[in-house]
A protein has these predicted regions:
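Extracytosolic and intramembrane catalytic regions of membrane-associated proteins
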Residues: 1-162
């Protein structure tokens, strides 16, 4: 089921990064995560967004390229400064990693040095639930190999423009 020997570039946002321990899959049929542009805040370089995992994944990740010049984001009353990731598959991206999402909608305000329409990026939702056609993988394991938080992961990746 899982290739434990070879590495493979499997993420559209990181074509040069090769992952270990991957499995071929067919379409899960799951609904992609959603991102709604609520509004551009007049007189600023900020935009309000709403993110949601439509399959109730535990984690949602927003990736914006370094060229977007993201300064910070607001979630609730908190402002969080950001920096570009310099390692791993998220290298070259601003990374907003939200955990514990499930069925919740998340409102964010993104603050840019200079906002330009059509900033391209990626929205990911990450879950430990695998597609139905991989149920036999669970059955083939003994109890010692049951998944953990960083074990099995199914990731939906959506190309976005904001």
């Amino acid at each position: 089921y899982v290739d434990v020997v070879n590495t493979r570039a499997i993420a559209s946002f990181a074509p040069e990064y090769e992952f270990r321990y991957w499995a071929n899959s067919i379409s899960s049929g799951w609904i992609e995560p959603s991102i709604d542009l609520k509004e551009k805040i007049k007189g600023t370089n900020s935009v309000k967004l709403r993110l949601k995992s439509n399959r109730q994944a535990s984690r949602v990740v927003l990736l914006l390229p370094e060229s977007s010049k993201l300064k910070s984001f607001n979630i609730g009353s908190q402002e969080v400064e950001v920096s570009v990731s310099s390692v791993g598959s998220y290298k070259g991206y601003y990374l907003i990693y939200l955990s514990g999402i499930y069925d919740k909608k998340v409102d964010l305000t993104l603050n840019f040095e200079e906002y330009k329409n059509e900033i391209e990026g990626f929205l990911l939702d990450i879950s430990t639930k695998l597609p139905k056609h991989l149920d036999k993988l669970y059955q083939a394991r003994t109890g010692i190999f049951s998944p953990v938080h960083r074990g099995d992961q199914a990731i939906l990746i959506k190309n976005i423009k904001i």
